[in-house]
Curated annotation (Swiss-Prot):
GO MF annotations in UniProt: alanine racemase activity; pyridoxal phosphate binding
Keyword tags: Isomerase, Pyridoxal phosphate
One GO BP: D-alanine biosynthetic process
Organism of this sequence: Synechocystis sp. (strain ATCC 27184 / PCC 6803 / Kazusa)
Lineage of source species: Bacteria, Bacillati, Cyanobacteriota, Cyanophyceae, Synechococcales
Cofactor(s) the record lists: pyridoxal 5'-phosphate
EC number(s) on file: 5.1.1.1
GO CC annotations, alphabetized: cytosol
Family, similarity comment: Belongs to the alanine racemase family.
Pfam family membership, one: Ala_racemase_C
Protein name: Alanine racemase
CDD domains membership: PLPDE_III_AR (cd00430)
Catalysed reaction, written as an equation: L-alanine = D-alanine
Summary of the function given for this chain in its UniProt record: Catalyzes the interconversion of L-alanine and D-alanine. May also act on other amino acids.
């Protein structure tokens, strides 16, 4: 593949390492679900899914119907959980056709699925979601027994799992997380009291998985951790994870500008002395947030260089003072390792007051993904 002005490198060995770290950590009795929604957090869903399954993942999770179809069209046969809400007959028919396993969040949705599947003459495994405190998708946890009982009575549905999602698993204060676990336990107890079957249970995302075995149940759903990032600093010692994604771009022009020269839109940066600068072929249309303008450092020859002026749609400028004889075509590292130095998505997220998930998902498809 031609290395264009900018690209994303995906370290397959690092991904395999991370999957195996989680596989060993949760043990053989707990299923490992690789969360590959949002194009595997910007890493490329098909390749990541294939690699994760080969390395020891048991299940895949996606958020939309289209994401699931993409995996099936690539020949992936592993079980796929669709996390998002589905409520149209056309989508239900497609789910059945592509052998995806949907999340059901309400009795009304369960009835709709059963009605459509009855017309199709198909039976489908389904996963019931309880709201234990996220206040997003799901049936309120006190109604768990009624919900499970209804699904058990619907002939076209096969109960595959019961799960919930944690709102604060990455917070050092675990009070809310523990409250959600207690509610999940009470919901399970209500099934036993009603003499209903207990299906596969899962509660943990990456952060909760790293909290230990008490959170693992029958399966864990690991997203961010697979890609080598920790959900929170206090969880950084739990496993040895390696970042999978690197973002690089080429220098497309080098210039020397005199004192008093404004750089880029709005002249947010004005040179105080004669200085060398470079234009780098990557911008906010590629996923470099414009709000990082004049706050970003990138790596050139393993040395940090400062980004200057407003980041534009397709390009940005960097200060080359301190770099000896720079050349057009040299490669700049925006995220990743160069020599002894490393820049992570966490660095960008901290500067912007956001989360690393958003940074990773922001890298657009016009940046080719190169497997290394």
């Amino acid at each position: 593949m031609i290395r264009q002005r900018a690209w994303v490198e995906i370290d397959q060995a690092a991904l395999v390492h991370n999957v195996r770290q989680f596989r060993q950590y949760v043990g053989p009795k707990t299923n490992l679900m690789a969360v590959v929604k949002a194009d595997a957090y910007g890493h490329g869903a098909v390749r990541v899914a294939q690699t994760a399954l080969q390395a020891g993942a048991d299940w895949l999770a996606i958020a939309t119907l289209g994401e699931g179809i993409e995996l099936r069209e690539a020949g992936i046969t592993a079980p796929i959980l669709l996390l998002g809400g589905i409520n149209s007959p056309e989508e239900i028919e497609a789910i059945a056709h592509w052998r995806l396993q949907p999340t059901l969040c309400s009795p009304e949705q369960a009835q709709l699925f059963n009605d459509i599947l009855l017309k199709l003459g198909k039976v489908l495994p389904v996963h019931l979601k309880l709201d234990t405190g996220m206040t997003r998708l799901g049936t309120p946890w006190p109604q768990a027994a009624n919900f499970v009982g209804l699904v058990q009575s619907l002939p076209q549905l096969r109960l595959a799992s019961l799960y919930s999602h944690l709102a604060t698993a990455d917070d050092p204060n675990t009070a809310t997380m523990l409250q959600q676990q207690e509610r999940f336990a009470k919901a399970i107890a209500s099934l036993r009291q009603a003499r209903l079957p207990i299906p596969k249970l899962h509660l943990a995302n990456s952060a909760a998985t790293l909290h230990g075995q008490a959170w693992h149940y029958d399966m864990v759903r690991v997203g961010l951790g697979l890609y080598g990032l920790y959900p929170a600093p206090h969880l950084g010692d739990c496993l040895d994870l390696k970042p999978v994604l690197t973002v690089r771009a080429k220098i497309t022009q080098i210039r020397t500008i005199p004192p008093g020269t404004g750089v880029s839109y709005g002249h947010q940066f004005v040179s105080e002395e004669t200085m060398p600068m470079a234009v780098v072929g990557i911008g906010y249309a590629d996923g470099v947030p414009r709000n990082l303008s004049n706050q970003l450092e990138v790596l050139l020859r393993g040395q940090p260089v400062r980004q200057i002026g407003a980041i534009t749609m397709d390009q940005m400028m960097v200060d080359l003072r301190g770099i000896d004889d720079p050349q057009v075509g040299e490669v700049v590292t925006l995220i990743g390792q160069d020599g002894d130095r490393q820049i992570t998505a966490d660095h960008w997220a901290s500067t912007l007051g956001t989360i690393s998930w958003e940074i990773l998902c922001g890298f657009k498809h016009r940046l080719p993904r190169i497997l290394i």
